[in-house]
Amino acid sequence: MKTLRSVFFYFTIVWSTIVLGASAVILFYTTLKHAAPHACSRLWGKVNLWAAGVQVEVKGLENVDSLKPCIYAANHQSWFDIFAILAKLPVQFRWLAKEELFKIPVLGIAMTANG
């Protein structure tokens, strides 16, 4: 069952990255706003957490003020941090990422569209 879940997850991450990444890029260039691509990214995070069978418990959301600038830092225990932040953080935000990630075909363009 574990192998089946892994195959399902990797299939889902590839296709969700292509479909939602392309959607984010198209929405950015047609609306010239970051809100629509961010919504695609949030969905991408939720879909991939679901496909992996991961449940995320978030504590302290009452301390998040969307009206004040803030820096959110993940401890980056795994790449699931990315999915969790996208799926659970209730504010629109921008990423800092290493240069190599922007060279990945669909992902790099989608990351640029997200700001």
Regions from the PLM with identified roles:
Residues 5-12, 41-97:
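Conserved H-X4-D acyltransferase segment
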Residues 35, 80, 102:
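Short alpha-helical
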Residues 96-97, 101-115:
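Soluble catalytic domains of enzymes that build or remodel membrane lipids, polysaccharides, and related
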Residues 1-57, 109-110:
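A transmembrane-helix-recognition feature enriched in membrane-embedded lipid enzymes
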Residues 23, 92, 113:
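Mid-sequence acidic-hydrophobic segments that form the walls
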